[in-house]
Amino acid sequence: MSQHPAPDGSPVGTRVVHRRYVPYSHAHYAGNLVDGAYSLGLFGDVATELSIRVDGDEGLFASYDDVQFKAPVRAGDVLEVEAVLVRAGTRSRRLELEVRVVARGEPTAERPGAARVLAEPLVATTATGTVVVPG
């Protein structure tokens, strides 16, 4: 899902959202926890689509600032990943990024595929980042 630039032609406010199931093959830790790098990879994917929509180029991720891991991501989760363009320079793009858990696997011995949609999305990871568009 994406929201296109404002009517005045400014790309600021452009928003892209992806959803992704976290497979059990990505769990590395007790409790089916997934490492934080998984969220960073998803940020790269959503930022790439935003760059393509705004600039017609995949862009290059230059930096992340203030990455915060606020809640666990687990195998069996369904994640919503969002990038919002908050500032556009000549070649740099400033993004606000967020990973939210929207559904969580709750397997049991009797129901190994059990899961539920969360009443409210759980913010798992936030960051700001800078993407550079080649000149």
PLM features: what roles do these ranges have?
Residues 1-36, 50:
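Catalytic strand-loop segment that frames the active site of acyl-thioester-processing enzymes
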Residues 30-48, 60-62:
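Compact, glycine-rich, soluble single-domain proteins
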Residues 20, 25-26, 59, 65, ...:
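Short, functionally important structural connectors and interaction interfaces within domains
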